């Protein structure tokens, strides 16, 4: 089948470096176009999953999609050149450039997140009404950047009132932002963190 054909460059005894194999698999997937919709998204996700699967990363943290988007015309031209002219070399060089750009973007975002967390932690810790609960909640925000009072209480293993108090402090400091405008069933977002993730 088409999907099995994508797996041809993935055999473990293939001497090609894993990133090169991921690039070749991406071209094959995009060429086969096995689904009616979503092939582009799945093909780009395929790269990230392969890189993690082969142990190059502990988590799926490499997203070349942004680099492809920045160089969209060249991306499509390189894919087309493989199909029409068999120009695998230029595709591979382009792909590896995009992977490097994605890694650079990821490192920059990680540094920015680290700095943001440090600044926000200092603001919380030095606030006159600081609580251990508020600090713990702040530490949980990167893996839970959007939450409710109920979710915060579950994450912290506490009742709703102290969770509400921690959220109120983080909201007062501008760390959390209420997103619904409602008085009930409010949802809070770690807005600055989400902006860092989406701007890249």
PLM-predicted stretches and their roles:
Residues 98-129, 133:
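Conserved alpha/beta core segments of nucleic-acid transaction machinery
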Residues 138, 143-156:
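Short acidic, hydrophobic short linear motifs in intrinsically disordered regions
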Residues 1-6:
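Positively charged, low-complexity/disordered segments
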Residues 7-111:
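Phosphate/pyrophosphate-binding active-site loops
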Residues 157-158, 176:
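The short coil/loop that forms the "turn" connecting the two helices of the helix-turn-helix
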Residues 130-131, 178-200:
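Short, cationic-aromatic polyanion-contact patches
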Residues 141, 163-173, 188:
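Basic amphipathic alpha-helical segments that dock to polyanions
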Residues 146, 172-178:
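Short hinge/loop at the helix->beta-strand junction immediately C-terminal to the helix-turn-helix recognition helix
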């Amino acid at each position: 089948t088409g999907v099995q054909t994508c797996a041809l460059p993935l055999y473990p005894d293939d001497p090609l470096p894993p990133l090169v194999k991921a690039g070749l698999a991406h071209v094959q997937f995009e060429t086969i176009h096995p689904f009616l919709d979503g092939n582009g998204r799945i093909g780009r996700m395929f790269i990230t999953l392969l890189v993690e699967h082969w142990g190059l990363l502990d988590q799926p943290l490499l997203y070349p999609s942004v680099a492809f988007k920045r160089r969209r015309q060249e991306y499509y031209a390189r894919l087309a050149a493989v199909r029409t002219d068999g120009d695998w070399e230029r595709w591979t060089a382009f792909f590896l450039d995009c992977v490097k750009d994605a890694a650079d973007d990821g490192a920059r975002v990680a540094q920015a997140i680290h700095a943001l967390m440090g600044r926000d932690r200092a603001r919380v810790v030095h606030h006159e009404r600081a609580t251990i609960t508020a600090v713990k909640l702040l530490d949980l925000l990167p893996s839970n950047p959007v939450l409710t009072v109920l979710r915060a209480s579950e994450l912290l293993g506490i009742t709703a009132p102290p969770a509400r108090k921690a959220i109120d402090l983080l909201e007062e400091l501008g760390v959390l932002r209420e997103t619904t405008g409602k008085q009930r069933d409010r949802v809070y977002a770690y807005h600055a963190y989400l902006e860092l993730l989406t701007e890249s």
